[in-house]
UniProtKB/Swiss-Prot annotation:
Gene3D superfamilies: Periplasmic binding protein-like II, Winged helix-like DNA-binding domain superfamily/Winged helix DNA-binding domain. The keyword Magnesium does not apply. The lineage of its organism: Bacteria, Pseudomonadati, Pseudomonadota, Gammaproteobacteria, Enterobacterales. This is HTH-type transcriptional activator AmpR. It comes from Enterobacter cloacae. The gene is ampR. InterPro entries: LysR_subst-bd (IPR005119), Tscrpt_reg_HTH_LysR (IPR000847), WH-like_DNA-bd_sf (IPR036388), WH_DNA-bd_sf (IPR036390).
Length: 291
């Protein structure tokens, strides 16, 4: 038999049906109908001029010819699949450099990285964290994930998620807070953005802290929450990025009032042309954030 006459679809149908001893299970595996499997097997039997299955009370049984053919097909299809996997795994690696603000990295991205690497093994993802003040051109970054209003000079920005801010503190401190005004009895922990506590206190219907109030300033919300867990003071932070701490009850949100001064964005310089790897990462991350 010459290669030009190999009935490949019929051979696939027979191999699946023979492994399962079931036309129904073969149809499910190959995503075709039961009748399609039956017709392919019939075509192969006519082509070979022999019977490959016999029906018995329990279902199907292979004939001697079927038993001889099955291991040959198993081996052939396994070798083909193995070679295709080798091609896929040796696809040229595409480097992708991402700078991500630390809070988003720990709150969202790190837990999803294994999923990305399984789905895109050809992309060499190189991550660096920053405190939201970053120079993408100087650092050679393809994308940066930043917190803010979405408008940075010379930059395209794609929305990822909202970032509501609220006070977070230890359960012991929270137990002593009877109204938002009581927060001012403690050291206030904040980022380098000066307006966070003022905006939150006003949203809660209270006077803002005085210019001389005890304040500790952090360049990382992750570090700030470490201080809050140690009882140093009360932090104002993006609550959705610290759900793991809230779930553990090491940190609590003492009041429901939240404010929003910015969101998280996936950004790239307008001068940076998108590569296939960049587009794949962007689609993957945006879809993840919709779930």
């Amino acid at each position: 038999m010459t290669r030009s006459y190999l009935p490949l679809n019929s051979l696939r149908a027979f191999e699946a049906a023979a492994r399962h001893l079931s036309f129904t299970h073969a149809a499910i595996e190959l995503n075709v109908t039961h009748s399609a499997i039956s017709q392919h097997v019939k075509t192969l039997e006519q082509h070979l001029n022999c019977q490959l299955f016999v029906r018995v009370s329990r279902g199907l049984m292979l004939t001697t010819e079927g038993e001889n053919l099955l291991p040959v097909l198993n081996d052939s299809f396994d070798r083909i699949a193995g070679m295709l996997d080798r091609f896929a795994n040796h696809r040229a690696q595409e480097k992708l450099k991402i700078g991500v603000v630390g809070t988003f990295a720990t709150g969202v991205l790190f837990s999803q990285l294994e999923d990305f690497r399984r789905g895109y093994p050809h992309i060499d993802l190189q991550l660096s964290t920053h405190n939201n003040r970053v120079d993408p051109a100087a650092e050679g970054l393809d994308y940066t994930i930043r917190y803010g209003g979405g408008a940075w000079h010379g930059t395209e920005a794609e929305f990822l998620c909202h970032a509501p801010l609220a006070p977070l503190c230890t359960p012991d401190i929270a137990a002593s807070l009877h109204s938002p005004a009581d927060i001012l009895r403690f050291t206030l922990l904040r980022s380098y953005r000066r307006d966070e506590w003022t905006a939150w206190m006003q949203a809660a219907g209270e006077h803002p802290p005085s210019p001389t109030h005890r304040v500790m300033v952090f360049d990382s919300s992750v570090t700030m929450l470490e201080a809050a867990q140690a009882g140093v003071g009360i932090a104002i932070a993006p609550v959705d990025m610290f759900t793991h701490l809230l779930a553990s009850e090491r940190i609590v949100q003492p009041f429901a009032t939240q404010i929003e001064l910015g969101s998280y964005w996936l950004t790239r310089l307008q001068s940076r042309a998108e590569t296939p790897a960049m587009r794949e990462f962007s689609r993957w991350l945006v879809e993840k954030m919709k779930k």
